[in-house]
């Protein structure tokens, strides 16, 4: 396999690098900074999307439509202890929100143990404030209570359609009923602030916006509509399939009347709105209105590659450093250097291209599975 990711420094080489701006020590004993670390664009680090597995039990046409994929070697996946160490380092440099992703995270057999070690860090004075997970919901009915017991705070479920026939067409699986059962199980388990993520594709499900809002309201959740994104490969993305934020608001305005935009207080990607009856929903317009300028998000693949951007073509291999003996403080140094060098504005650069070609061809993705969006939390 062609390696395009740059290994992080490990072993003796790391001793040449010192933390020069340490001002305090966290509860975990890690050196931290009094002032936030900023990248070259002035953005701080706050949100980590942590993939725990690259495999998925669906084959959604906008994400991973092919029958077979080159999976990451199982021995390369970060262990629970390795995840805990790396998470400590991320918290020490400013991460206050962590979201577990996949692939499909509920496939991983030791997911509960991962949740337990991370949830124990939430609210302990370290700075971590939130732990959430994104799932396709297929396995959720059987695992919702287990996730709650392990310490999961919030759940986001992907739900693009309420029609079983459309679900099968987009996911290539007949498990729509399991997703609905999973959503109901989340409410029964006592979760609140639940989100339903719906990728809106022109000519496919753009006629279901109000139905999805009503469904979300009935299950005590909030729907977030997502513009169809270009993730490359065999997805056959094209700009003419994008149903834009403006078009969504126009469609919903005709149905419900005046829609009020809600104030935005953080760097979350969704813009939130309120209907006349008080129902709220969100729109993530990452295709037509990229949020690169305020993006505080980075990604960690299931095998420990740290990516500064969803569209990054290279990253830093934290797994190699940890397995070579790096401590959490060593990882802190790697993160500090890496974030200060960050200048990624991937979605803005894609938007600026006059002719939108496929992000990455299938042939290149087959050579390096790290470039697949499903390995980096999509």
Curated annotation (Swiss-Prot):
Its EC number is 4.1.99.22. GTP binds at residues 49, 99, 134, 195, 297-299. Keywords: 4Fe-4S, GTP-binding, Iron, Iron-sulfur, Lyase, Metal-binding, Molybdenum cofactor biosynthesis, Nucleotide-binding, S-adenosyl-L-methionine. Residues 40-259 form the Radical SAM core domain. S-adenosyl-L-methionine binds at residues 62, 103, 158, 229. SUPFAM superfamilies: Radical SAM enzymes (SSF102114). [4Fe-4S] cluster 2 binds at residues 292, 295, 309. Catalyzes the cyclization of GTP to (8S)-3',8-cyclo-7,8-dihydroguanosine 5'-triphosphate. HAMAP family: MoaA_B. This is GTP 3',8-cyclase 3. It comes from Mycobacterium bovis (strain ATCC BAA-935 / AF2122/97). The lineage of its organism: Bacteria, Bacillati, Actinomycetota, Actinomycetes, Mycobacteriales.
